[in-house]
Design a protein with these regions (language model features):
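Catalytic nucleophile loop
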Residues: 63
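Cleavable N-terminal signal peptides of Sec/SRP-targeted secreted and luminal proteins
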Residues: 1-15
Length: 264
């Protein structure tokens, strides 16, 4: 897999101050540190105003990166990227999960997830507690009860950002559902591995025309599905190929829907 920095420009040539700029972090999971490297490249190589994003979006573990960007004000890109780089350079010091007392088998049978993710909750409280978002955000998660995809940003206060990120990063199967805001949550990657349409709607609510919205997407899957000869595949390679195809289309689906839905 390679890191793709895919920029969708829903604009003609207008004054820069008239743009609503969106930064969307894909789900990523263990590859989210690469998103930070790509963001650093954007910051170092683009006009400073072009990376002063108005709306920040994140799905699954991309929601953590989104939250860390959002707690820094526009214009503080240097401090923001330094903090993010520092976090992921020391990722070996981060404990995101631990085994249940009787291991993954206990998780599968009685805990709702293979691993216990309470260490991740503790890390989020340490890193984000008391730090509020300074920009408009979207953080996607799925309500376990009804299956709705919900933007947790609507529920966030300064004291609740870490809880929202914890809910948005409750990776289905691996971790149990997270109970926050009176509901149970899974991460949103099963529906939108990359969230684009929601942030565009945020810009629209802020009074921007579609032609004045710019979306930068950081995703950790390829934008090209590799071909392979499957003539002699047995069951396991066929299943792996199916999963590869499924992940590819789910990853680019949100972007394609945005492009087709907002041709301006």
């Amino acid at each position: 897999w390679i890191l793709i920095v895919f920029t969708v420009i829903l604009a003609c040539v207008f004054a820069k101050s008239d743009k609503c700029r969106i930064l969307s972090f894909g789900s990523g999971v263990e590859k989210v540190p690469y998103q930070v490297g790509a963001l650093k490249a954007l910051i170092e190589n683009m006009d400073p105003e072009d990376v002063q994003y108005d709306v920040i979006s994140g799905v699954s573990f991309g929601a953590f990166n989104a939250a860390m960007v959002s707690v820094h004000k526009k214009g503080d890109e240097k401090a923001m990227i330094e903090e993010l780089e520092g976090i992921w350079k020391k990722s070996d010091k981060i404990t995101a999960y631990q085994n249940w007392w009787f291991g993954p088998a206990q998780g599968a049978i009685s805990k709702g997830g293979l691993y216990d993710n309470t260490p991740w909750e503790a890390y989020l409280k340490k890193t984000l507690k008391g730090r509020g978002a300074t920009r408009v955000m979207t953080l996607g998660a799925v309500d376990v009860a009804n299956g709705d995809y919900v933007d947790l940003a609507d529920l966030i206060t300064t004291e609740k950002l870490e809880q929202a990120v914890y809910a948005a990063t409750a990776l289905n199967v691996f971790f149990p559902p997270v109970t926050e805001f009176g509901r149970d949550w899974f991460d949103g990657s099963g529906i939108w591995p990359v969230e684009v349409i929601g942030p565009i709607a945020r810009c629209e609510k802020m009074g921007y025309n579609y032609t004045d919205i710019v979306v930068d997407v950081l995703m950790t899957t390829s934008d090209v599905l590799p071909e392979r000869n499957s003539t002699n595949d047995s069951t396991i390679p066929s299943v792996l190929r199916y999963l590869e195809i499924s992940e590819f289309y789910s990853g680019v689906n949100g972007i394609k829907r945005a492009v087709y839905g907002f041709p301006e």
